[in-house]
Amino acid sequence: MTAAIAPALYRVLSPPRSEGGKAVAVFADAAGDLQARAAAAGAPLSVFVEAVDVGSVSLRVFTPTQEKGSSDSGALAALAFLQTQSELLDVVEVQMGGEIMPAQLCGGEWLLRQGDVGVTEVPALDLSPLGLGVRSVQIASASRPNLVIEVADLGALEAFSPDAEGIAAVNRATGTTGLVLYTPGGPDRAEVSFRAFGPLKGFLEDGASSNMFACLVGVLGAQGRLPTDLKMLRGAQRMPGAPARLTAQFTPAANGAADVWVGGRAERVSP
């Protein structure tokens, strides 16, 4: 396979009947100047398949300007692509950026393991820098600690205008790296709606964050608000102009959630 072959363009974690989610270009090989190929792909994220067999996949991930290391969205797009090209087991290992992450196929969607999520309460905290009313505040961690705040309703969630300095201030005050705002319910029968912010991580708002959704799953578990029948949760991420839909699989735990997997659909849009 040569570098001249065009990539397959996928839209990952997009809601039904929507142009949201993340655009990812998937290259079936990893030959030549990968940075130049990513720059010419016309997508904000490109993933290259270095190696694949029935039980493992090795990937490299690039933005148009630099190698990214790892990306859940990139992995989901690559797995969806490879599923159409070769035979994969329902559980595989994904190698990227020096990490190995288990993935599983569940109900036609690939999910990546985020691990166990622990939740702690937050002592008295000045949230005035955020400029919104809150119903509950916790810290949840799935490898990285995030401040997780419940707001009044979907209107308040969608009306929130993020201020990088204000969010960074409450993150520093709590020793967290990101902020998740959420409220129950959502479009297309989602059980919860949320937004994810991370000025201390180098971005203001992320439109589709698997790790931060996993933290939210942990908070709902600690509150006893997770579904008790299917052990699955649908989340509507509500970044203005770029909605996303994520699926989580979990095992309930007293102080959060165990064995959390997060993913969603990846749809090929071209060629």
Region spans (language model):
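Active-site proximal loop and beta-alpha junction motif in alpha/beta enzyme cores
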Residues: 1-70, 75-271
